[in-house]
């Protein structure tokens, strides 16, 4: 299945300047209006659709968001839409709502990564609480992605030798041990280490180790990295 569903964002949309968006996919017009009014009444931005295909064909801003999704929809069902989003590598927390839920359906939804599964009728506050939890999850995911992206950019500014030194230092090796691993003089390792700390903007060794863990980098001892 293909569509125009695009999360690259539209001009001017940033995490800092744009509120979280609640996307709603509900085929029942009265229910869709009710949900839209509920979310707007507490200051949330809402974009509503009558079908999953309609949402797939829309261009969406890439901002913190969640999806309130009816299970039973015309054409592409809510559960199948969840699968399609995963296939398209689109990550958005999903809150399922249904008036005809059962255990297998709930299990499939939760295994697919749904944040919650609410049976109609549900309390307004119950849904609002689920939306808050879902948008917070998405905010943290995006924040983590930005952190990793920033660290990768900094790491790529290091020379191959500096990268090798960082990897070894992050394993807990002393300068003398790093020097032996790379066949360098200890004073040279100290210089490279200083460059690494500065370029990575690390305030301490512990800070550098945390960065290495976040990046998932490691070094094999006896690895000889050339300049």
From Swiss-Prot:
SUPFAM superfamilies in UniProt: CheY-like
Modifications after synthesis and translation: Phosphorylated by NodV.
The entry's DNA-binding region: 175-194
GO function term, MF aspect, one: DNA binding
CDD domains named in the record: LuxR_C_like, REC_FixJ
Disulfide bonds: none
Modified residues (4-aspartylphosphate): 70
GO cellular component: cytoplasm
Keyword field: Cytoplasm, DNA-binding, Nodulation, Phosphoprotein, Transcription, Transcription regulation, Two-component regulatory system
PROSITE patterns, alphabetized: HTH_LUXR_1 (PS00622), HTH_LUXR_2 (PS50043), RESPONSE_REGULATORY (PS50110)
Its biological purpose: Member of the two-component regulatory system NodV/NodW probably involved in the regulation of the transcription of genes involved in the nodulation process.
Protein name: Nodulation protein W
Native source species: Bradyrhizobium diazoefficiens (strain JCM 10833 / BCRC 13528 / IAM 13628 / NBRC 14792 / USDA 110)
Organism classification: Bacteria, Pseudomonadati, Pseudomonadota, Alphaproteobacteria, Hyphomicrobiales
